[in-house]
């Protein structure tokens, strides 16, 4: 029996061996249903999270082995080998006590192994240590099939995976891991007999619940793993303490063989090293605009290697709980590391927990308190009270805060408008506001809103109310005029008042004589006819306006009736007869004198004829390379050499007869009796009806430079010769007329207006019909497009361009020869090879006409041959028309224009060519040489100390200068009068301005300010320094005396601790001597502040309004930070300036605009240059940066003194007028303007000024040669190269 039982047991044992169930170290091949998959590593977590269970995961798995005990995973225990998780939705099962559990199934490694007991709780940790149960958080935002960092081992021993917890310490982060217990797999074979042969604990069971601590060393960014609660643990053949060191973050160490003396056999575990916690930092990403209803937190990583640390394993969660414990959980799926909560309450405290999960386990947790921003206040309800004529009271109840806003409004914005809107910012402690300065009898709309100032200003909804002001006294009538239609009747007319201030319109006329009432009229229009008055009587007419409620002040005019005409008839008849006789006698005497004078001239010409050629000098032509030196040599000693040359040229060459012009029937066609054309080259017109005099006109053919009869020099047409003039234009086929005079100069008639006006359209001159098609006014000239047709010819009309130069002064010559070079460019643009001669005329047709022709011809010679013979050409001109180039100053002007052109060339650029031209000018070829733009800048004269500065450097005036290097020149400084003359509103204007003008004004006071020519000559600008505290009164006095309309302020009041401009305005009224200044309004834009001032003088009746534009985006840098804002401000302030007058005195002492910065140099100069360039671009479609800057440098020291500023002017114009398809597109001034500086570091030139102190030696030595000036200049100007501008080359765009 015993033997039989033993044999049965032995057979059963072999059967077990045959099924490979009991072989140590072997694992049966898993079935498809139980195939192992990647497992999610569970990272440290301070709070337990709910576990996931799936339909494919049973709650527990039984094993066959020693005792066949059943083991269930507890919280904190995670098996290495997991079944494939179903993608179906998870169910969350919270564990008791708030700890979440998750159950996994695994194929058994060895059926004889006994699982370790429970381990479902976290081991106790050291202070600051957080032990995290190895469970997947119950957040559906994270998929259950998260990729794992560990796989099951195919080795003989079972594979185990660690669970992780973290501890923050000063030297690094300690991470603790619990290993899961070994799992068994239930056999599919029916159990027969369980044999327990184990005498020693298995290593799989011992290491199943092992705790692994990860200690982070921030110094080398590695981890050290420590197997807790196991003594003498062996990893392979070495102690685990020596092996598990210097582990890289996010690394995977698989199949580590671990064993111990008290267990067998050895097993393997996998380690999943987490990332370092110091790689994460929490930041607030809430937009200010949404800060009242949103919270946004963003985790940022630093030096985290995502090639090792898969970003898919890192998740971010944000929990925010308000005071009412409502829990809000959001996750931004588009930006995983950013979490944002919306639709929150304003001004509410939230406690937010921001977490990072590594493979679904908390790695980092931050708890912060966040308060949302203030909410939008409630809309106040305004009430418009009973208005008066010019004010009303607006009141409103104090608004109650909305539930989501915990604070009251911080202020209110009240706006009211009739045609234009004005707004006032009010504090939050007011509930009413009196709106003043309203217009009577007008409809107004008031809007009111409340606002709070949180992170940004939040405005509530505006509520409106309306009111209508009451009537008030009307203004006086305008333009009252009186006239006498008959000897004893008076017509009285007037215009309506500026403001009627009432519902109706009545005009009242009261007539008085000798203080007694005569009569009274009432009418609805201001046209009164008063008759039946006494003859030769003085009357007083009073006209007032009545608006139905009030009557305005009366306007008074005095008028007298005439004598009775019938009583004077006999006397007048007698007087007419006597006057006629006397007039006939005078005319006969004049005729007789002219006849005698003509015969005397013929005799004189015959006497000097043989001496004409002998008095000429031998003057050599001048080569271009010595043109400047030759000019300086001849202009020296008050132009002695020029005078000698000019006086050697005969005024009239007597060998050429002048008989036709002296014929009796032609004498009335000559404007001047001594300026007549030679017979041999006069222009002959076609004869009309056998009239011999019809062929004559005072005009001569003039040869150009190697081009015969290129010009016709003519006198300015008289009223009697206008028809002949147009006949000459038609017959000579001329297409260009150059007029170098104004019709009237100095109250003298210089030329008849021989063209139709734009209003007239067409005018006939006998058979010639002239039609005007276009009229364009520019500062220095007027261009008119005319069509000329002949009534008797079938040919179509011809296009004729008429160019009138308007900047030639009444006396002398133009100050700047560049003006004539500019005129020449315009003329040559309209002339062509196939057209007839260019007709040039002034008044007499010799002085200015000869000067222009001489400049044009000599420039052609300079360009063709590189040399000029001015003397020889002027002699040639005199041989073709007497007195050509009439005075010495005109002869010198020709040389000056040639020097200007030879030194500086053509610098004007059309807007259509600006972009391509600027692109080429910035190129360097070769790269070591300056670009053409740099070379152009270097050619700019410095003009430093070119005129005297005596007044500003006087001892008593030095303290009035902010910068000793920026002192106005005497010739154009702005003088201040001590006392205003009551009889005149402005000071007398002189025809010229010289250095001595200011010096001789003993009654004038000094202020650091200079007159600067604006684009629209003769209008001026004033460039000034920022006022000092002791000169504020003088500053306002200058504004009043010079009738300034706009002040441009380009500086702050202080720069750091240094005052750069005194605050010359204040609240309320400020008094400065006889001046009273009151700030009426302030409006702030994004780039500037607009203030409105009212100026009153004790000796003047009417106040003046002055506007101040303070640029707030130019903080003292060399260039403005936002150029587009500066352009926008210029466009706005131009609306405040008066219209430019087409005519006026050249040297005009009023300025509509005053510009100042700290010392009136760099920012002021750049602004003035930009202002003039924008006007030129808008008017003429051309810009000339070089000439604009040169003109400003002559007017004030220190302007546009660096290459960067010079290039800025080109760039900003190019940005405002971008090219599109080859055409210039005028863009909105608000478009963004960007600049690319072509030079790394430009050097300032000799014209630059430092904040204070004298010029150094290098600056003194940078002086050069000056621009030519007229001989009456006391000092010569300088021409200075602007230093060596050779910065490192940059890549051209």
Curated annotation (Swiss-Prot):
Protein tyrosine-protein phosphatase required for T-cell activation through the antigen receptor. Acts as a positive regulator of T-cell coactivation upon binding to DPP4. The first PTPase domain has enzymatic activity, while the second one seems to affect the substrate specificity of the first one. Upon T-cell activation, recruits and dephosphorylates SKAP1 and FYN. Dephosphorylates LYN, and thereby modulates LYN activity. Substrate binds at residues 810, 842-848, 886. Its main location: membrane. Residues 53-72, 88-110, 149-169, 1283-1293 have a biased composition (Polar residues). Keywords: Cell membrane, Glycoprotein, Hydrolase, Membrane, Phosphoprotein, Protein phosphatase, Repeat, Signal, Synapse, Transmembrane, Transmembrane helix. The modification Phosphothreonine is found at residue 1267. It is found in: Cell membrane; Membrane raft; Synapse. The modification Phosphoserine is found at residues 964, 983, 986, 990, 993-994, 998, 1229, 1286. Residues 43-174, 980-1003, 1240-1293 are annotated as: Disordered. Residues 589-1293 are cytoplasmic. The chain crosses the membrane at residues 567-588. It comes from Mus musculus (Mouse). GO terms for molecular function: ankyrin binding; heparan sulfate proteoglycan binding; heparin binding; protein kinase binding; protein tyrosine kinase inhibitor activity; protein tyrosine phosphatase activity; signaling receptor binding; spectrin binding. It comes from the Eukaryota. PANTHER family: RECEPTOR-TYPE TYROSINE-PROTEIN PHOSPHATASE (PTHR19134), RECEPTOR-TYPE TYROSINE-PROTEIN PHOSPHATASE C (PTHR19134:SF539). It holds the Pfam family PTP_N. The lineage of its organism: Eukaryota, Metazoa, Chordata, Craniata, Vertebrata. The active site is at 842 (phosphocysteine intermediate), 1157 (phosphocysteine intermediate). SUPFAM superfamilies: (Phosphotyrosine protein) phosphatases II (SSF52799), Fibronectin type III (SSF49265). This is Receptor-type tyrosine-protein phosphatase C. It is a single-pass type I membrane protein. GO terms for biological process: alpha-beta T cell proliferation; B cell differentiation; B cell proliferation; B cell receptor signaling pathway; bone marrow development; cell cycle phase transition; defense response to virus; dephosphorylation. Residues 642-901, 933-1216 form the Tyrosine-protein phosphatase domain.
């Amino acid at each position: 029996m015993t033997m039989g039982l033993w044999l049965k047991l032995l057979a059963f044992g072999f059967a077990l061996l045959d099924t490979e169930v009991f072989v140590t170290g072997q694992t049966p091949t898993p079935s498809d249903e139980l195939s192992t998959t990647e497992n999610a590593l569970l990272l440290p977590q301070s709070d337990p999270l709910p576990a996931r269970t799936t339909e494919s995961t049973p709650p527990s798995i039984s094993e066959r082995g020693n005792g066949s005990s059943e083991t269930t995973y507890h919280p904190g225990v995670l098996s290495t080998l997991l079944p494939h998780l179903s993608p179906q939705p998870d169910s969350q099962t919270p564990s008791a006590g708030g700890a979440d559990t998750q159950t996994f199934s695994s194929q058994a490694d060895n059926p004889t192994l006994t699982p370790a007991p429970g381990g479902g709780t976290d081991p106790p940790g050291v202070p600051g240590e957080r032990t995290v149960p190895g469970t997947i958080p119950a957040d559906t935002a994270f998929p259950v099939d998260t990729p794992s960092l560990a796989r099951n081992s195919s080795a003989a021993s079972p594979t185990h995976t660690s669970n992780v917890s973290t501890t923050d310490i000063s030297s690094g982060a300690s991470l603790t891991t619990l290993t899961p217990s070994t799992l068994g797999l239930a056999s599919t074979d029916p159990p027969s007999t369980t044999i327990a042969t184990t005498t020693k604990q298995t290593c799989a069971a011992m290491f199943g619940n092992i705790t692994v601590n990860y200690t982070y060393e921030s110094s080398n960014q590695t981890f050290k793993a420590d197997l807790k609660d196991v003594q003498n643990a062996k990893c392979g053949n070495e102690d685990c303490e020596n092996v598990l060191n210097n582990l890289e973050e996010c690394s995977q160490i698989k199949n580590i063989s671990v064993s111990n003396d008290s267990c067998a056999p050895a097993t393997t575990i996998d380690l999943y090293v987490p990332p370092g916690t110091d790689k994460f930092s929490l930041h607030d990403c809430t937009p200010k605009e949404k800060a009242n209803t949103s919270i946004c937190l963003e985790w940022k990583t630093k030096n985290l290697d995502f090639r090792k640390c898969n970003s898919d394993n890192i998740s971010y969660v944000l929990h925010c709980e308000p005071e009412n414990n409502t829990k809000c959980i959001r996750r931004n799926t588009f930006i995983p590391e950013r979490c944002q909560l919306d639709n929150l309450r304003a001004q509410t405290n939230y406690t937010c927990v921001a977490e990072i999960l590594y493979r679904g386990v908390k790695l980092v947790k931050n708890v912060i308190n966040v308060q949302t921003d203030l909410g939008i206040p409630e809309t106040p309800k305004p009430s418009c009270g009973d208005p008066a004529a010019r004010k009303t009271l607006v009141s409103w109840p104090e608004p109650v805060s909305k539930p989501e806003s915990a604070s009251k409004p911080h202020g209110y914005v009240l706006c009211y408008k009739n045609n234009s809107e004005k707004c006032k910012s009010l504090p939050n402690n007011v509930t009413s506001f009196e709106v003043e300065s309203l217009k009577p009898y007008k409809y107004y709309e008031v809007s009111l809103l409340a606002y709070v100032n949180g992170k940004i200003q939040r405005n509530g909804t505006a509520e409106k109310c309306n009111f209508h002001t009451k009537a008030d006294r009307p203004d006086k009538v305008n333009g009252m005029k009186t006239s006498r239609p008959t000897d004893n009747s008076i017509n009285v007319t007037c215009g309506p008042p500026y403001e009627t201030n009432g519902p109706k319109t009545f005009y009242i006329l009261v007539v008085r004589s000798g203080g007694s009432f005569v009569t009274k009229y009432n009418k609805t229009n201001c046209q009164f006819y008063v008759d039946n008055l006494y003859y030769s009587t003085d009357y007083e007419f009073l006209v007032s306006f009545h608006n139905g409620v009030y009557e305005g002040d009366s306007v008074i005019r005095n008028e007298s009736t005439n004598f009775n005409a019938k009583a004077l008839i006999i006397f007048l008849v007698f007087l007419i007869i006597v006057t006629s006789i006397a007039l006939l006698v005078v005319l006969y005497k004049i005729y007789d004198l002219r006849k005698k004078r003509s015969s005397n001239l013929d005799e004189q010409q015959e006497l000097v004829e043989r001496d004409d050629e002998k008095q000429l000098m031998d003057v050599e032509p001048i080569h271009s390379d010595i043109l400047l030196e030759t000019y300086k040599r001849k202009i020296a000693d008050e132009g002695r050499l020029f005078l000698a040359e000019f006086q050697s040229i005969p005024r009239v060459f007597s060998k050429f007869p002048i008989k036709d012009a002296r014929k009796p029937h032609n004498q009335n066609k000559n404007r001047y009796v001594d300026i007549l054309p030679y017979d041999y080259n006069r222009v002959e017109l076609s004869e009309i009806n056998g009239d011999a005099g019809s062929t004559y006109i005072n005009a001569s053919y003039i040869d150009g430079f190697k081009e015969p009869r290129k010009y016709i020099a003519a006198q300015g047409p008289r009223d009697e010769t206008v028809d002949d003039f147009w006949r000459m234009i038609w017959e000579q086929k001329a297409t260009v007329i150059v007029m170098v005079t104004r019709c009237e100069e100095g109250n003298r008639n210089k030329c008849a207006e021989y063209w139709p006006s734009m209003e007239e359209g067409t005018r006939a001159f006998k058979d010639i019909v002239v039609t005007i098609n276009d009229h364009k006014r520019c500062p220095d000239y007027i261009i008119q497009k005319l069509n000329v047709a002949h009534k008797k010819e079938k040919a179509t009309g011809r296009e004729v361009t008429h160019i009138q130069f308007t900047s030639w002064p009444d006396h002398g010559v133009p100050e700047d020869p560049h003006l004539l070079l500019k005129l020449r460019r315009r003329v040559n643009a309209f002339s062509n090879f196939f057209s007839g001669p260019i007709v040039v005329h002034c008044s007499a047709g010799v002085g200015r006409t000869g000067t222009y022709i001489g400049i044009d011809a000599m420039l052609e010679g300079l360009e063709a041959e590189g040399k000029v013979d001015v003397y020889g050409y002027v002699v040639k001109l005199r041989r073709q028309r007497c007195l050509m180039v009439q005075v010495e100053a005109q002869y010198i002007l020709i040389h000056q224009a040639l020097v200007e052109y030879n030194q500086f060339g053509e610098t004007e650029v059309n807007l259509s060519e600006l972009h391509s031209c600027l692109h080429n000018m910035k190129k360097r070829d070769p790269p070591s040489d300056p670009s053409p733009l740099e070379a152009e800048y270097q050619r700019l004269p410095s003009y430093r100390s070119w005129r005297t500065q005596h007044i500003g450097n006087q001892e008593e005036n030095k303290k009035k200068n902010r910068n000793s290097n920026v002192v106005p020149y005497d010739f154009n400084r702005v003088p201040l009068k001590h006392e205003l003359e009551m009889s005149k509103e402005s000071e007398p204007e002189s025809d010229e301005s010289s250095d001595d003008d200011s010096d001789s004004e003993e009654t004038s006071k000094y202020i650091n300010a200079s007159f600067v020519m604006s684009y629209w000559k003769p209008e001026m600008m004033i460039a000034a320094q920022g006022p000092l505290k002791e000169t504020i009164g003088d500053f306002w006095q200058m504004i009043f005396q010079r009738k300034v309309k706009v002040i441009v302020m380009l500086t702050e009041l202080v720069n750091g601790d240094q005052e750069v401009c005194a605050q010359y305005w204040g609240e309320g009224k400020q008094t400065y001597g006889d001046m009273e200044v009151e700030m009426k309004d302030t409006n702030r834009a994004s780039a500037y502040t607009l203030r409105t001032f009212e100026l009153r003088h004790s000796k003047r009746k009417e106040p003046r309004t002055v506007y101040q534009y303070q640029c707030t985006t130019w903080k003292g840098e060399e260039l403005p930070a936002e150029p587009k804002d500066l352009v926008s401000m210029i466009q706005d302030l131009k609306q405040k300036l008066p219209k430019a007058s087409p005519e006026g005195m050249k040297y005009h002492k009023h300025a509509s605009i005053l510009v100042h910065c700290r010392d009136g140099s760099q920012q002021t100069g750049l602004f003035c240059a930009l202002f003039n360039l924008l006007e030129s671009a808008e008017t003429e479609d051309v810009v000339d940066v070089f000439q604009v800057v040169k003109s400003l440098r002559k007017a004030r020291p220190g302007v546009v003194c660096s290459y960067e500023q010079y290039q800025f002017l080109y760039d900003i114009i190019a940005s405002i007028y971008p090219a599109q398809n080859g055409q210039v597109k005028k863009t909105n001034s608000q478009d963004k303007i960007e600049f690319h500086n072509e030079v790394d570091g430009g050097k300032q030139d000799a014209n630059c000024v430092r904040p204070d102190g004298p010029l150094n030696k290098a600056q003194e030595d940078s002086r050069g040669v000056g621009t030519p000036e007229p001989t009456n200049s006391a000092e010569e100007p300088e021409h200075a190269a602007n230093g060596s501008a050779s910065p490192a080359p940059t890549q051209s765009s």
